[in-house]
Amino acid sequence: YLAAWKGPVYEKDDPYGDNQTNEDLTAVKHVQEMQIIESKDYEKIKEAVFKYGGVQTSIYNALRSSQSSSPYYNKSTDAYCYIGTEKPNHDVVIVGWDDSYSKDNFNTDLEGDGAFICQNSWGDNFGENGFFYISYYDTNIGTHNVVYTDIENTDNYDHIYQSDLCGWVGQLGYNKDSIYGANVFTAEGNETLKAASFYATGKDSQYELYVVRQFEDETSLEKMIPVASGKLGNAGYYTVDFNQGIEVDAGERYAVVLYIITPGSVHPMAIEYAADEATENVDLDDGESYISANGSKWVSVDTVEKSNLCIKAFSDNR
């Protein structure tokens, strides 16, 4: 949704809780980078809050609305803590912390003090004007964390090319930590390719990006033009600017190639595929993708898994 430029939209234009969605809304910003913070790394979470303003995290929410009650929520102190085996079912944004926030503010007996200050999506009627505390000892707080590290204006690029509207659903690989992947697109006009985006599925990933012009079939992938390389500290979604723009002509088929090494992984390439009921209607016929173990012998990704590779391209008109 966010990586595909379908959002975000302003809450005033699509209010929470009205059970309606305005399909005519367009993104008011373009999200170009999202980093994943490792589970329960509270210091990294605090650092990200300080640097970027907020960290999205998942909790088990026993409340069903802003008016609900729960043994895990102390309404008088706006303090929540769940300890148990239930899986996360709700996202909130960590916007601050208080290491000395008393454990006595919670309904649960806890080992120590400390809490994150979080903002919910239920409006000003919940908590203290929409904010509340979640104990450091909550089972799920800080386990699944995303921080939005590059949010740009909507005029940053003229075009986005993509076939993975659902984004990172699963992973593909050759039972080793490296893989080549290529997505093929058709230029809408006379353009200059400026950047590509992809997912690093684990920390400390190294990448190389290439472009292939005048793509005809997989043999065209022998003519890769190097455009960028680097190393990424965290798992996440990244947009990388090319070292030089690559001009393509209207109607020209071209490929963006990603070579990625993710230490410890055996399936380092992020893919979109029909994994469950939530993704069973995903369009897997809108893309053309190839994979390779060594960069010389390529096969269509559909021969391995009916899927789309999560590689996008960005261009400007010329």
Language-model features: locations:
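Predominantly the structural core of cysteine protease catalytic domains
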Residues: 1-115, 119, 124-202, 230-234, ...
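Short, surface-exposed secondary-structure junctions/capping segments
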Residues: 142-154, 239-242, 285-291
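Ser/Thr- (and often Asn-) enriched beta-sheet segments in non-cytosolic proteins
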Residues: 33-36, 192, 208, 226-231, ...
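Short beta-strand-to-coil "C-cap" segments at the C-terminal boundary of structured domains/repeats
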Residues: 149-152, 214, 312-318
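Residue-level signal for short segments within beta-strands and strand-turn junctions
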Residues: 96-98, 196, 211-216, 260, ...
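Short, surface-exposed beta-strand/loop patches at domain edges
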Residues: 259-318
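Aromatic- and Gly/Pro-enriched, solvent-exposed loop/edge beta-strand patches characteristic
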Residues: 204-284
